[in-house]
């Protein structure tokens, strides 16, 4: 069984679909260039029910950006695209657990120590010319993770779908997986049936 995170939620309907499906985490994207960007107003409409741990995704964030979100919504985890030092600073400042996103093309890219953080999101490096660091529906060769001794808890992401998540778990050894574009009918538009299918497939893996 792999735990499942559904990221990029923007509406109460899809948040409810993820929680009702049994998702282990729900994620919200606070990066304006992403089609999954959620505004503070939309976050308020989703509500403050914290039955499932919430994760906020930020890219090279200024502290004020995180503070604005935390005034509206508690976040159990910050998923940050930045260097280790910046991630540690945000962890110390806000007292939240921090997962650092790490782009991987080969085994050499995998973290070798915990960097003073709570975990990692391991995904493919963005394609050349991409305007965002994640959510690009691109997978990497999961076989590069064979023999890796993870220094902290981690989630596998990048190009995952209901159809391939079981194979990804087997090949990588992941105990947790993260999906965004793989449960969408169009960029930024989550599909309730795909959310249900993904969580079920991950939990059955």
Swiss-Prot record:
- Database matches in InterPro entries: Aldolase_TIM, PRAI_dom, RibuloseP-bd_barrel, TrpF_fam
Q: What keywords appear on the UniProt entry?
A: Amino-acid biosynthesis, Aromatic amino acid biosynthesis, Isomerase, Tryptophan biosynthesis
Q: Kindly report, in one word, the top-level EC class recorded for this enzyme.
A: isomerase
Q: CDD domains under this entry?
A: PRAI
GO BP term, example = L-tryptophan biosynthetic process
* Protein family: Belongs to the TrpF family.
The entry's protein name is: N-(5'-phosphoribosyl)anthranilate isomerase
The organism named in the record is Acidiphilium cryptum (strain JF-5)
